[in-house]
Amino acid sequence: MSDGNDFAELLWENGQAVVHGRKKHPQPAFPPFGFFGGTGGGGGGSSSRAQERQPGGIDAFAKVGGGFGALGMAPAVHDFASGFGATTQDNGDDDTVPWIHYPIIDDEDAAAPAALAAADYGSDFFSELQAAAAAAAAAAPPTDLASLPASNHNGATNNRNAPVATTTTREPSKESHGGLSVPTTRAEPQPQPQLAAAKLPRSSGSGGGEGVMNFSLFSRPAVLARATLESAQRTQGTDNKASNVTASNRVESTVVQTASGPRSAPAFADQRAAAWPPQPKEMPFASTAAAPMAPAVNLHHEMGRDRAGRTMPVHKTEARKAPEATVATSSVCSGNGAGSDELWRQQKRKCQAQAECSASQDDDLDDEPGVLRKSGTRSTKRSRTAEVHNLSERRRRDRINEKMRALQELIPNCNKIDKASMLDEAIEYLKTLQLQVQMMSMGTGLCIPPMLLPTAMQHLQIPPMAHFPHLGMGLGYGMGVFDMSNTGALQMPPMPGAHFPCPMIPGASPQGLGIPGTSTMPMFGVPGQTIPSSASSVPPFASLAGLPVRPSGVPQVSGAMANMVQDQQQGIANQQQQCLNKEAIQGANPGDSQMQIIMQGDNENFRIPSSAQTKSSQFSDGTGKGTNARERDGAET
């Protein structure tokens, strides 16, 4: 190809199309495709400088192509890398490029490599498009970049540094949203004049319009490109600015900038994957991308209505709608995809935090009936405690009643019912028992007769005391005394050291004591209290100290024994009289006269008469030998 003195080379080397040319030369029939595009000002110049600073530019793109080799796109990447390498070498010093070692190709032979490339790339997939592709490649004239509308360049005079408006499509990647794999396309929105300038020659049907689609044979079939162009025009005509965000993800036209880095590099899909119809697949994606979000919003509404009859705030629904647009406009590019995913995660976290806050508030509301339930539980526990307490109190009362019944059985003649009366009876009974114990502990042998005891104690049988049997104070309990019927009174001196001195009662003997008499006798020093004696006299009997006493039988004693007892009693009486005399002399008081009278009575009357001795001897014989006893008595006198 030559234009005057200028020329360029198009070589086919190792399956790659290599184009070499000089500065200020027009573009070849296949202008190189800028691998990095952009719309910013000065993008072309900066990209060429960046590539000049990278001596291994072609190798770098070869590496990129190797990365896409697993997807079956290595040949296309190598082709475009060759074109890019040519561009970067043309921007530098041409003396360093070994283009002069290649043969020169004339104009009539320029279409041969294009036809060969068409045959190589198109024969495997669409055989019906081989002829049309070859004719389009042969009829494509050299296109100058000045004829294309340039946007936002830095004012450089070199047309190669200006951004090239090309129609590029990304790899129809299969993005997974909720388990749904849908092929999507991603491109940048382009101003309307450039889009019309780039696409209208294609739709006009003229042969010159095919030059706009640079390397369309290597990227995808012409049918797919035409379908995407029509869908883009239909989307731009029907969508407004509000819905343009979701509609622009179908097909977009991009001005590729070389300084944008490898992340924005176009990913060329395999031609088999590109043969899928994009339009039927894109519409379900728009509907299914928003479908998983609708149940979440409805879930929040249902939760709001279920708890406490309230509805969730409206801003939560709006917050859930925001990720829908982000998901619908997600691209294949790793940078944009990562940003959109991060934004979606942030929105999701915000919604979860708001849902947790509302749940905590609802839990606070739910705690109010919980408080009632707790209070009900406490009241139940309280009633249960009271019930246990009542049961223990009932058992305690039962034990008290049982003890009171046992006490009632112990108290004689106790027919009280109430507890106070029973306790009074028990107190009186205990007092009586205490008095009896004190009298028994004195050692005087005095026993309280039953008539002096309380009614509750009259049935008691107090055993006889034999400590002092010589006093004759058996009181009818088996301790017999001598018969004193001939004497008018029996005076008993008080016992020395006795707690209850009992003065002798003149001329009387109590009933049942074995002492005959008709007078009364004061008992135990209580003045005015007398005991009438109306019973007949009982024959007296003698008692011996230390001998067993039997109330039913009469002891058999001889006359000598009776004399011994009499002498003993007289000696004891003399000793008692002497003691009383000494006490009367030592202390003179109003009671001394009475004591002196008692002492005189003792001296005069405390003697056993002969008649008593005779009777005792008769009783002692027991066999009718009383005459012998009387004879002995007379002899003794």
Swiss-Prot record:
Entry protein name: Transcription factor PHYTOCHROME INTERACTING FACTOR-LIKE 15
Region (Helix-loop-helix motif): 398-433
Pfam families registered for this protein in UniProt: HLH
Primary subcellular site in the record, as a coarse category: nucleus
Location of the protein in the cell: Nucleus
Positions of the UniProt region annotated as Disordered: 35-54, 146-213, 356-397, 601-637
Limits of the bHLH domain: 384-433
InterPro entries: bHLH_dom, HLH_DNA-bd_sf, PIF1-like_bHLH, PIF3-like
Family in the record: Belongs to the bHLH protein family.
Protein role: Transcription factor that may act as negative regulator of phyB-dependent light signal transduction.
Complex and partners: Interacts with LF and PRR1.
SMART domains, per the entry: HLH (SM00353)
Residue ranges with Basic and acidic residues bias: 384-397, 628-637
Feature: compositional bias, Gly residues: 35-46
Region (Basic motif): 384-397
Keyword Hydrolase: no
Induction remark: Down-regulated by light in dark-grown etiolated seedlings.
Superkingdom of the source species: Eukaryota
Keyword DNA-binding tagged: yes
One GO term describing the cellular component: nucleus
Composition bias type Polar residues, residue spans: 149-170, 608-621
Sorted UniProt keywords: DNA-binding, Nucleus, Transcription, Transcription regulation
MF terms in GO: DNA binding; DNA-binding transcription factor activity; protein dimerization activity
Source species: Oryza sativa subsp. japonica
Any one Gene Ontology BP term: negative regulation of red or far-red light signaling pathway
